[in-house]
Amino acid sequence: PPRPTPLFHFHGLMDKNAPFEGGNGCGPGDTSALLPVPDVIADWHTMFGCQEGEEVTLLETAEARCTSKAGCEDDVQLCVFPDGIHSWPGSAEKESPIRECRGGEHVSSFSATEAIWEFFSGHELEVSTP
């Protein structure tokens, strides 16, 4: 993007539709290899001028681990779910055409909707006038 924009990425480590480590997923429409999530997040850290060094742990539970880096021009947060699949955490679990390739479990105790609302509520978009 032309300016830093907050990024909040959720990903299940057992997601076989969009594998965390990259490569080809399974399910309808999977025709191209995906980049590994750690590489994509590292690219965002570079674009946003994040400081080298340790991640800051924002949340750590049995079902979720959310991290960020210090000194970025805007927030880049990653929440991973060790047993998580390709679903929206905290939503009602639904049948899906990708069910046969999902692997792990649907995350029900973490609300992605509440987390992303809280995340973006803490950011303002500066509007420039021409």
Write out the residue ranges for each language-model feature.
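Flexible, surface-exposed loop/gating regions in the mature catalytic domains
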Residues: 1-130
